[in-house]
Protein backbone atom coordinates (compact mmCIF):
# COMPACT_ATOMS: atom_id res chain seq x y z
CA UNK A 1 0.00 0.00 0.00
CA UNK A 2 1.24 3.47 -0.84
CA UNK A 3 1.97 5.61 2.22
CA UNK A 4 3.06 9.15 2.84
CA UNK A 5 6.67 9.59 1.77
CA UNK A 6 9.37 9.92 4.39
CA UNK A 7 9.63 13.65 3.71
CA UNK A 8 5.86 14.09 3.96
CA UNK A 9 5.82 12.27 7.29
CA UNK A 10 8.70 14.42 8.51
CA UNK A 11 6.85 17.60 7.54
CA UNK A 12 3.63 16.46 9.23
CA UNK A 13 5.39 15.55 12.46
CA UNK A 14 7.26 18.85 12.42
CA UNK A 15 4.04 20.81 12.00
CA UNK A 16 2.21 18.91 14.74
CA UNK A 17 5.14 19.46 17.11
CA UNK A 18 4.37 23.20 17.09
CA UNK A 19 2.32 24.73 19.88
CA UNK A 20 0.25 26.68 17.35
CA UNK A 21 -0.72 23.47 15.52
CA UNK A 22 -3.18 22.57 18.27
CA UNK A 23 -6.63 22.48 16.69
CA UNK A 24 -5.36 21.67 13.20
CA UNK A 25 -5.87 18.26 11.60
CA UNK A 26 -4.41 16.65 8.51
CA UNK A 27 -6.96 16.61 5.68
CA UNK A 28 -7.18 15.71 1.98
CA UNK A 29 -5.15 13.09 0.18
CA UNK A 30 -2.49 13.09 2.88
CA UNK A 31 -5.06 12.13 5.50
CA UNK A 32 -6.40 9.37 3.26
CA UNK A 33 -2.91 7.90 2.99
CA UNK A 34 -2.18 8.31 6.70
CA UNK A 35 -5.46 6.52 7.48
CA UNK A 36 -4.81 3.65 5.07
CA UNK A 37 -7.82 4.60 2.95
CA UNK A 38 -6.04 5.34 -0.33
CA UNK A 39 -3.11 4.21 -2.44
CA UNK A 40 -3.11 7.35 -4.59
CA UNK A 41 0.08 9.36 -4.00
CA UNK A 42 -0.26 13.03 -3.12
CA UNK A 43 2.07 15.94 -3.78
CA UNK A 44 0.82 18.16 -0.97
CA UNK A 45 -0.32 18.21 2.65
CA UNK A 46 -3.39 20.07 3.90
CA UNK A 47 -3.77 21.15 7.52
CA UNK A 48 -7.24 22.46 8.40
CA UNK A 49 -8.38 24.26 11.54
CA UNK A 50 -11.78 25.37 12.78
CA UNK A 51 -12.94 29.01 12.73
CA UNK A 52 -12.13 30.75 16.00
CA UNK A 53 -10.00 27.84 17.20
CA UNK A 54 -6.73 28.32 15.33
CA UNK A 55 -4.61 31.10 13.85
CA UNK A 56 -3.22 30.51 10.38
CA UNK A 57 -0.80 33.42 10.73
CA UNK A 58 0.62 32.23 14.05
CA UNK A 59 0.91 28.64 12.83
CA UNK A 60 2.59 29.86 9.64
CA UNK A 61 5.15 31.93 11.55
CA UNK A 62 6.11 29.03 13.80
CA UNK A 63 6.11 26.61 10.88
CA UNK A 64 8.45 28.77 8.78
CA UNK A 65 10.82 29.14 11.75
CA UNK A 66 10.85 25.36 12.17
CA UNK A 67 11.50 24.88 8.45
CA UNK A 68 14.49 27.22 8.61
CA UNK A 69 15.86 25.32 11.60
CA UNK A 70 15.81 22.19 9.43
CA UNK A 71 17.86 24.04 6.79
CA UNK A 72 15.16 23.49 4.21
CA UNK A 73 14.34 26.06 1.54
CA UNK A 74 10.84 27.43 1.27
CA UNK A 75 8.74 29.84 -0.78
CA UNK A 76 5.61 31.47 0.60
CA UNK A 77 3.17 31.20 -2.29
CA UNK A 78 0.07 32.65 -0.65
CA UNK A 79 -0.91 34.16 2.69
CA UNK A 80 -4.21 35.51 4.01
CA UNK A 81 -5.95 35.44 7.38
CA UNK A 82 -7.60 32.11 6.66
CA UNK A 83 -5.19 30.47 4.21
CA UNK A 84 -1.48 30.04 3.53
CA UNK A 85 0.45 27.98 0.99
CA UNK A 86 4.13 27.15 1.26
CA UNK A 87 6.44 25.27 -1.09
CA UNK A 88 9.12 23.41 0.87
CA UNK A 89 12.29 21.94 -0.61
CA UNK A 90 14.33 19.50 1.44
CA UNK A 91 15.05 15.88 0.56
CA UNK A 92 12.02 16.28 -1.73
CA UNK A 93 9.60 19.06 -2.70
CA UNK A 94 6.20 19.54 -1.12
CA UNK A 95 3.31 22.01 -1.09
CA UNK A 96 1.71 22.63 2.31
CA UNK A 97 -1.62 24.40 2.82
CA UNK A 98 -2.81 25.82 6.14
CA UNK A 99 -6.47 26.77 6.10
CA UNK A 100 -9.57 27.58 8.11
CA UNK A 101 -12.41 25.23 7.21
CA UNK A 102 -15.69 23.88 8.55
CA UNK A 103 -15.30 22.39 12.02
CA UNK A 104 -15.14 18.58 12.23
CA UNK A 105 -18.52 16.86 12.42
CA UNK A 106 -17.10 13.51 13.57
CA UNK A 107 -14.54 12.63 16.28
CA UNK A 108 -10.94 13.26 15.20
CA UNK A 109 -8.81 10.17 14.52
CA UNK A 110 -5.23 9.78 15.69
CA UNK A 111 -2.45 8.40 13.49
CA UNK A 112 1.30 7.96 14.08
CA UNK A 113 1.95 11.29 12.37
CA UNK A 114 -0.81 13.26 14.09
CA UNK A 115 -4.56 13.99 14.15
CA UNK A 116 -6.65 13.52 11.01
CA UNK A 117 -10.32 13.72 10.13
CA UNK A 118 -12.16 10.47 10.80
CA UNK A 119 -12.47 8.05 7.86
CA UNK A 120 -16.16 8.77 7.27
CA UNK A 121 -15.61 12.52 7.53
CA UNK A 122 -12.79 12.25 5.00
CA UNK A 123 -15.19 10.43 2.68
CA UNK A 124 -17.85 13.12 3.11
CA UNK A 125 -15.37 15.92 2.53
CA UNK A 126 -14.08 14.18 -0.58
CA UNK A 127 -17.61 14.01 -1.98
CA UNK A 128 -17.92 17.75 -1.31
CA UNK A 129 -14.64 18.29 -3.15
CA UNK A 130 -16.12 16.45 -6.13
CA UNK A 131 -19.23 18.62 -5.82
CA UNK A 132 -17.13 21.81 -5.80
CA UNK A 133 -14.42 21.11 -8.38
CA UNK A 134 -14.77 17.54 -9.74
CA UNK A 135 -11.09 16.97 -10.47
CA UNK A 136 -9.85 13.60 -11.67
CA UNK A 137 -8.40 12.69 -8.28
CA UNK A 138 -11.74 13.48 -6.59
CA UNK A 139 -13.53 10.90 -8.70
CA UNK A 140 -10.94 8.26 -7.87
CA UNK A 141 -10.97 9.00 -4.14
CA UNK A 142 -14.77 9.07 -3.90
CA UNK A 143 -14.96 5.82 -5.88
CA UNK A 144 -12.60 4.05 -3.46
CA UNK A 145 -14.24 5.50 -0.35
CA UNK A 146 -17.79 4.85 -1.49
CA UNK A 147 -16.98 1.23 -2.20
CA UNK A 148 -15.79 0.99 1.41
CA UNK A 149 -18.59 2.88 3.18
CA UNK A 150 -21.45 2.81 0.67
CA UNK A 151 -22.95 5.68 -1.31
CA UNK A 152 -25.59 6.60 1.24
CA UNK A 153 -23.20 6.81 4.20
CA UNK A 154 -20.80 8.98 2.21
CA UNK A 155 -23.62 11.25 1.05
CA UNK A 156 -25.04 11.52 4.58
CA UNK A 157 -21.59 12.40 5.94
CA UNK A 158 -21.25 15.11 3.30
CA UNK A 159 -24.62 16.61 4.23
CA UNK A 160 -23.58 16.77 7.89
CA UNK A 161 -20.68 18.95 6.78
CA UNK A 162 -22.59 20.96 4.15
CA UNK A 163 -26.35 20.82 4.62
CA UNK A 164 -27.04 22.58 1.31
CA UNK A 165 -25.58 19.73 -0.79
CA UNK A 166 -27.97 19.36 -3.74
CA UNK A 167 -28.48 15.92 -5.27
CA UNK A 168 -29.24 17.14 -8.78
CA UNK A 169 -26.23 19.45 -8.90
CA UNK A 170 -24.04 16.67 -7.53
CA UNK A 171 -25.34 14.39 -10.28
CA UNK A 172 -24.38 16.97 -12.91
CA UNK A 173 -20.89 17.23 -11.43
CA UNK A 174 -20.55 13.45 -11.52
CA UNK A 175 -21.51 13.47 -15.18
CA UNK A 176 -18.54 15.74 -15.94
CA UNK A 177 -16.34 12.66 -15.49
CA UNK A 178 -16.50 12.25 -19.27
CA UNK A 179 -14.19 15.23 -19.73
CA UNK A 180 -11.27 13.14 -18.43
CA UNK A 181 -9.52 10.56 -20.58
CA UNK A 182 -8.76 7.16 -19.08
CA UNK A 183 -5.11 8.13 -18.74
CA UNK A 184 -6.02 11.20 -16.68
CA UNK A 185 -7.71 9.16 -13.96
CA UNK A 186 -5.15 8.15 -11.28
CA UNK A 187 -6.32 4.56 -10.93
CA UNK A 188 -5.36 1.21 -12.42
CA UNK A 189 -6.60 1.04 -16.02
CA UNK A 190 -8.41 -2.22 -15.27
CA UNK A 191 -10.79 -0.30 -12.98
CA UNK A 192 -11.51 2.71 -15.17
CA UNK A 193 -14.51 1.18 -16.91
CA UNK A 194 -16.04 0.11 -13.61
CA UNK A 195 -15.42 3.57 -12.15
CA UNK A 196 -17.19 5.25 -15.07
CA UNK A 197 -20.20 2.96 -14.75
CA UNK A 198 -20.24 3.49 -10.99
CA UNK A 199 -20.60 7.25 -11.30
CA UNK A 200 -23.04 7.02 -14.20
CA UNK A 201 -25.33 4.85 -12.06
CA UNK A 202 -24.91 7.00 -8.95
CA UNK A 203 -25.63 10.18 -10.91
CA UNK A 204 -28.76 8.57 -12.36
CA UNK A 205 -29.95 7.62 -8.87
CA UNK A 206 -29.30 11.12 -7.54
CA UNK A 207 -31.00 12.82 -10.48
CA UNK A 208 -34.12 10.73 -10.00
CA UNK A 209 -34.26 11.19 -6.23
Which role does the model predict for each range below?
Residues 1-209:
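Compositionally biased terminal segments of proteins
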Amino acid sequence: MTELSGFQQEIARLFFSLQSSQGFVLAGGGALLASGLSIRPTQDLDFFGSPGQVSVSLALDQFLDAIQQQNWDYELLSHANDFARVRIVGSAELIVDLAIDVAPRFPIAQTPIGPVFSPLELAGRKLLALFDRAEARDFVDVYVLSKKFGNQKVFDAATQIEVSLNKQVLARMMNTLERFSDDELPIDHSEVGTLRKYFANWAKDLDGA
